[in-house]
A protein has these predicted regions:
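Feature captures the FAD/FMN-dependent oxidoreductase FAD-binding
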Residues: 1-39, 167
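Short hydrophobic core segments
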Residues: 37-48, 71, 114, 223-225
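Alpha-helix capping and helix-loop boundary segments enriched in small/acidic/polar residues
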Residues: 31, 35, 51-62, 93-104, ...
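An anion/pyrophosphate-binding glycine-rich loop and adjacent beta-alpha core
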Residues: 70, 76-192, 258-264
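FAD/FMN-dependent oxidoreductases across multiple families
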Residues: 177-221
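Glycine-rich loop(s) and the adjacent beta-strand/alpha-helix scaffold that form part
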Residues: 42-96, 149, 241-258
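Glycine- and aromatic-enriched mobile tails/lids
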Residues: 14-15, 110-119, 123-128, 138, ...
Length: 286
């Protein structure tokens, strides 16, 4: 059974035998405001990243890092939280992503003077440089006063030298987004862009079986994490494009299998006397 519109606010850990063990979660029912306690032999966190802590992000409004925060409040560690990736070509001020395919098709980044500035930062690969290099270069242009717009806080993506048919056929999303959100036609106009917060490499530390680690070697029995909220350290400090899809497929599957296998043999841990007490206080103080 699926419980839609339930928002998990706390993790229940059993510490009756000393070391923590997953025992369930406490959730807030959005439709009624009721607090519910769910017992569980195994728990998987797949709560996504925390892009909404930044002013401009490609992330959904719900991605505020709550899963990571819940784990941290239970005294468990987080890992590599400083490793956050910015996608270079987000629509300025909005964060809506414009695919890197635009530069792959021949799109050029220009500053307010019309200069193809990536020639200075990456003379060989220019606009096809990795995300971190391009993002830093764009920020540097703005910091040094070569940004465009009323506040000089973005640069331009130039596709106007490409055939209109190529843009419409190969980059339909870009044309739609730019026209819809900015009223700009990429076929004939420069598109305002600036780096947008995109992906967290850090998060809840796990091993390759997605078991959550409470230190470098010991796991929390029954607790698993996968996806962007987890840090299994496969991306290092700078994820390569599309590797997040590979990550969630591989480790999402592993988490499901591992959690099911654990639950099939484990006993249900006892719940603390007032399992929902902290959450009730938290909600009442909002």
């Amino acid at each position: 059974e699926f419980y839609n519109e339930f928002y998990v606010l706390d993790l229940i850990l059993d510490r009756s035998e000393g070391e923590p063990k997953a025992a369930g979660v406490v959730a807030y029912e959005l439709a009624t405001g009721e607090i519910h306690v769910f017992t569980a032999k195994s728990v998987i966190f797949a709560s996504g990243g925390f892009g909404k802590v930044f002013k401009t992000t490609s992330n959904a409004h719900t991605l505020t890092g709550d899963g990571m925060a819940i784990v941290y409040r239970k005294g468990l560690p987080l890992e590599d939280m400083e490793f956050y990736q910015f996608h270079p070509t987000g629509l300025a001020g909005l964060g809506v992503l414009l695919t890197e395919g635009a530069r792959g098709e021949g799109g050029i980044l220009r500053n307010v003077d019309g200069e193809r500035f990536m020639e200075r930062y990456a003379p060989t690969i220019k606009d096809l440089a990795p995300r971190d290099m391009v993002s830093r270069a764009m920020l540097q242009e703005v910091r040094e006063g070569r940004g465009a717009g009323p506040h000089k806080d973005y640069v331009y993506l130039d596709l106007t030298h490409l055939p209109a048919a190529q843009i419409e056929e190969k980059l339909p999303d870009i044309t739609e987004f730019a026209r819809t959100y900015l009223g700009v036609d990429p076929v004939s106009e420069l598109v305002p862009v600036f780096p947008t917060a995109h992906y967290a490499m850090g998060g809840i530390p796990t091993n390759i079986e997605t078991e959550v680690l409470r230190n470098n070697t010991d796991v929390v029995p029954g607790l698993y994490a996968a996806g962007e909220c987890a840090c299994v350290s496969v991306h290092g400090s700078n994820r390569l494009g599309t590797n997040s899809l590979l990550d969630i497929n591989v480790f999402g599957r592993r988490a499901g299998i591992a959690a099911a296998e654990y639950a099939s043999t484990a006993e249900q841990p006892p719940l603390p006397e007032d399992a929902a007490g902290h959450v009730v206080s938290l909600v009442e103080n909002l």
